[in-house]
Amino acid sequence: MKSNEILNFFKENPVQYLSTIGLDGKPKVRPFQFMLEEKGKLYFCTCNKKRVFEEIKGNPYVEFCIMDKNMDWLRTSGKVIFAEEFSIKKKIIESNKLVKEIYKSYNNPTFEVFYLEETNFSMNYMSEVMEQESKL
């Protein structure tokens, strides 16, 4: 799968499911939303008051799962790196109405932005047995 196909899959399927290891050591899954891509990095955001933030700090290895209308799905795993660049935070705030309503400003101290490093992708087709693995 090519990097532009991966990016389009994220954009075309706005709800992704993020899997973490909970504070109790058990898996946790919740809906998330891809924010933007910059220099080959996939960016997401959260609030540092949420449990998911603490879970990621405790174990930065996560996996996203995204399914399209054809029931094909993309698994994306990697290591979370928190980004402090105000330029990225500003782009996210300016491009997402809901995020702007929640955080008001890119310098809100609870607004956290992260990207994935050591990223692996696995495309799975309902009609096929094989997985296609790739990197961005």
Language-model features, listed with the residues they occupy:
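Extreme N-terminal tail/first-helix region
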Residues: 1-17, 134-136
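Acidic-histidine catalytic/liganding microenvironments
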Residues: 13, 59, 96
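Hydrophobic/aromatic beta-strand elements that line small-molecule binding cavities or substrate pockets
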Residues: 32-35, 78-80
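A short, Trp-centered hydrophobic/proline-enriched beta-strand micro-motif
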Residues: 9-23, 62-66
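Charged, gly/pro-rich active-site loop segments
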Residues: 75-136
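A short mixed-secondary-structure module that forms the rim of ligand-binding clefts
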Residues: 35-71
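Residue-level signal for well-ordered, solvent-exposed loop/turn and beta-edge residues enriched
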Residues: 24-26, 79
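General beta-strand recognition
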Residues: 17, 42-43, 122
